[in-house]
Design a protein with these regions (language model features):
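Conserved beta-strand-loop-alpha-helix junction that forms the acyl-donor binding cleft
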Residues: 150-160
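Short alpha-helical segment within the catalytic ATP-binding CA
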Residues: 117, 130, 158
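Conserved active-site tyrosine of GNAT-family acetyltransferases
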Residues: 163
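Structured interaction and signal-relay segments at domain junctions
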Residues: 166
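Glycine-rich acyl-CoA binding loop
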Residues: 124-129
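GNAT-family acyltransferases
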Residues: 1-121, 134-138, 142, 151, ...
Length: 189
């Protein structure tokens, strides 16, 4: 029996270029390029050990200095890789910061990864699914990517649920970032 390939249809987020970056709009959210002025937003998220538990090698909260360095890397990466990098996500109506989502090459060059994280107060409101769906559509329909993966720590079940809601296929475990990760994937329709 032939396995069906999960696909991601174009949900129609509005994509536009902003001065110094890009932006994607969804029903509730504005995703735009990070700027150095976003340090406090990123610190509120990355400074929380609950958020960082499954992020990076150490899984620990970041200091203000580490966040300032991270913003520099995010901005630099976005300039070198148009259409990719972590995007700042906020509510369209209020401007409240609700997280970050973006596309990045996996370090071994084997795939493009969808990555996202949210401040703890924003968990459970559908923001992760909404922003990730828009970024997936951007990757497939604007950047022309054929395949995008989502990687999670094996014990990060909430993130795995988000990836499954997006229609990504669970491909089991593989080594990435020097550790065992759960791999999910989707292909362009």
């Amino acid at each position: 029996m032939k396995r069906e390939r999960p696909t991601v249809p174009n949900p129609g987020p509005l994509l536009h270029r902003e001065r110094g970056g890009m932006a994607i709009e969804t029903a509730r959210l504005l995703l735009r390029s990070f700027t150095p002025a976003d340090v406090d937003d990123l610190l509120a998220m990355d400074g929380d050990a609950r958020v960082m538990r499954y992020i990076g090698a150490e899984g620990k909260a970041r200091s203000r200095d580490e966040v300032v360095e991270a913003i520099g890397r995010i901005v630099d990466f976005a300039e070198r890789h148009p259409g990719m990098s972590l995007l700042h996500a906020s509510e369209r109506g209020t401007g409240r910061f609700v997280g970050g989502c973006g596309l990045f090459p996996v370090p071994d060059g084997s795939a493009i990864e969808l990555a996202y994280r949210l401040p703890h107060a924003c968990w459970g409101h559908g923001y992760a699914t909404e922003m990730a769906r828009a970024v997936l559509a951007h990757g497939f329909h604007t950047l022309g990517l054929a395949r995008i993966v989502g990687l999670t720590y094996p014990q990060n079940v909430p993130s795995q649920r988000v990836l499954l809601k997006l229609g990504m296929r669970d491909e089991g475990e593989a080594e990435h970032y020097g550790r065992t990760m759960r791999v999910f994937a989707a292909e362009r329709t």
